[in-house]
Amino acid sequence: MSEIIESVKNLSIGFNSQKGKQISILRNVSTNIKKGETVGIVGESGSGKSTLALAMMGYIKQGLFPLKGECLFKSEDLLKMSSRQLEKIRGRKIAMIPQNAGQALTPNLKIGYQIDEALRLHTDLNKTERDKKISELLNKVRLPSPETMAFRYPHELSGGQQQRVAVAMALAGKPDLLLLDEPTTGLDVTTQAHVLELLRFIAKDTGTSMIYVSHDLGAIAQVSDRIVVMYAGEIVLEGPARKILKEPIHPYTYGLLKSIPKLSLAGLPASMPGSQPQPGSINEGCSFYDRCNLATDNCKKNSPDLEHIKELDTNVRCFNYKELINQNNNLQTSITKKSNNSEANEVLKLKDVSISYAKQKFFDQLLNKISDQNPTVKDINLSLIHI
């Protein structure tokens, strides 16, 4: 059995309203992070995913406080530690890769100096060893010319390069657990893919456990071994990534997957009606009741517990999950259809299109000679249909 790095037990976090009422934004959350495991925490804004992840570093946002429960890192409760005790853990044992690396990096300090600062804080290396380690870290995150890169300022790097530097700084202390809070926000699709591939490599190469927080289920699916789906401050589904993506047996997760656009299918992706309930507004019943097509009177009156489904190795918070098990062969069937008649709806068609430009020199131009052709586009076929 794999070693558990961190365990969250019955954690509730809340705040006091202006009327003095205690309101929960995390409710009875329990989960484990195993050694070498990457866990994706996904949910809409306000679902509590970032609050949970930060609590797993021993950090509670200003104005919030733990109502009950524990965050045990190697059997020690982070929520009961002093600031001095947490300083010895953060960076050295638990590190965080921020959402916006451009804002997290100090603009007037060179990259190498900032990584060196992390090494000075979290390791016992001397100056010569640190200089060597800086090059090793920059090389590990696949930045070109590490020796040159170390002398650049953050503004001289692209967004993807800045994110790689943030990863290098987080790895400086050789942490057991990495927290990634929306690390690809603001990056273009290609750069995002490169960063996600890098994270997969680092997880495999170093054996570091990771918590990946995002609202993007597609990104979560690419890096996670296990997925935790949160809604209105509760875990509604938890299990192996492949199982959840193939058989999303909670209606909220089912809706999230239906909302992902697919190039292979025509039509618009589905959207879920309504929005999450506000903190403190749920008095009884299932928190997803108002948005659920499977809801019954039982769902309105009673709140489901997180039930373990042994055959799927999955935990689900739903009375009617069995109704979803037989609906998972093709998530898009009910909302879209494949286009079988593209000719009838075709508005634009390119067939075997090639475009070249001439590498024409000055004297060739005077003599009206035909120069060598340099192809830029070759044999393109494209069909645009009206939906």
Predicted regions and their residues:
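Short catalytic/signature loops enriched in Gly
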Residues: 4, 147, 240-346
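Conserved ABC transporter NBD signature motif
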Residues: 65-77
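Conserved ABC ATPase signature
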Residues: 152-157, 161
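A short, proline-enriched helix->beta-strand linker immediately N-terminal to the Walker B motif
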Residues: 172-176
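P-loop NTP-binding/switch modules centered on Walker-like glycine-rich loops
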Residues: 187-268
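Conserved small/polar residues in nucleotide/adenosyl-binding loops
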Residues: 385-387
